[in-house]
Amino acid sequence: MTDNKALKILQEFLDISEPTLEQAIEVFTPLTVGEYDDIHIAALLTHIRTRGETFADVAGAARAFLNAGHPFPITGKGLMDTAGTGGDGANTINVTTGASLVASAGGVKMVKHGNRSVSSKSGSADVLEALGIPLNLDPDRAVRQLEASNFTFLFAPAYNPAVAHVQPVRKGLGISTLFNTMGPLLSPGRPEFQIMGIANPEQGQLIAEVFKDLGRTRALVVHGAGTDEIAVHGTTQVWELRDGTISHYELTPEDLGISHHELADLAGGNGEENAKALRAVFAGTGEPAHHDAIAATAGAMFYLNGTTDSIHEGVTHADQLIKNGTVAAWLKKHEEANYGSADRA
């Protein structure tokens, strides 16, 4: 039952038309520790949806849940995370997950935060499991995995258990809420670099501002022609955060040095089917659209952490790593690895 103190905080927030960041943190903090009844959680989420999400709402909720979460033992400098909001209905192969493996093979330190499928046939965890990448590692083993391979996967529920308090309400409401964009913002690695795909381009500037507030040095927020990915089928809108400044621009497949493909060419299946498609790309026998989509997103990763000076150069670098066998060799070395507590040579 919601106590009087929490109810007072909620009531005051609902009466404010333009809350401050501090007020948003204050109203979401009781939610992180289960102090609101479901009906009061629903009131909060529907109020924000009706009023319209503000920077304070999103940043305040993110800060409250990060404060309640469990950070990864290694945080910050040099780390990257990448994920999308989902919800675009495209059901493509796991482009971002495949690209993150290419980036790791090329030296990017990837702390990928994700979950199993929610809005698609295959979530990042589903395809990684099918590829043989170890999941469900405790923090110490995950650190060893990162040190050995430049990649680790962090299951969202293990690091942000407080989100469970809102899940029954989200499911019951059946409508999009602020929490549809929250997942990628709660990265346990508190990374220096982050790429986030968004299904709704109207949120681009806002999300970039939230990344600035959360301390990201560089970030890319992308929306690709109706999808939460860099598009090979049309124009991608990009909001780039770099050293405190946010810029907005557009990219076409031609800008990236890749061919134009149809969105249908990226249609995916379940985790096993998508893993097969990724393996084919890494082996040099994949569908051209799959190859180009993965290279495009990996190219953005190489640009973001400074490996290359432009996304176009990053795409070329990713293409070379795939074609010369570096990525396939990386996967063969690190799939099914144990990362146990015993000393390794």
Curated annotation (Swiss-Prot):
Lineage: superkingdom: Bacteria
E.C. code: 2.4.2.18
Residues where 5-phospho-alpha-D-ribose 1-diphosphate binds: 84, 87-88, 92, 94-97, 112-120, 124
Pfam families documented for this protein: Glycos_trans_3N, Glycos_transf_3
Enzyme class: transferase
Gene Ontology MF, one: anthranilate phosphoribosyltransferase activity
UniProt: anthranilate 1 binding residues: 84, 115
Binding site for Mg(2+) 1: 96, 229
GO-annotated cellular components: cytosol
Keywords: Amino-acid biosynthesis, Aromatic amino acid biosynthesis, Glycosyltransferase, Magnesium, Metal-binding, Transferase, Tryptophan biosynthesis
Requisite cofactors: Mg(2+)
Listed GO biological process terms: L-tryptophan biosynthetic process
Residues reported in the UniProt entry to bind anthranilate 2: 170
Pathway assigned to this chain's UniProt record: Amino-acid biosynthesis; L-tryptophan biosynthesis; L-tryptophan from chorismate: step 2/5
Reaction(s) this enzyme catalyzes, per UniProt: N-(5-phospho-beta-D-ribosyl)anthranilate + diphosphate = 5-phospho-alpha-D-ribose 1-diphosphate + anthranilate
Residue numbers binding Mg(2+) 2: 228-229
Cofactor binding notes: Binds 2 magnesium ions per monomer.
Protein family (similarity comment): Belongs to the anthranilate phosphoribosyltransferase family.
Subunit structure: Homodimer.
Name of protein: Anthranilate phosphoribosyltransferase
Recorded name of the encoding gene: trpD
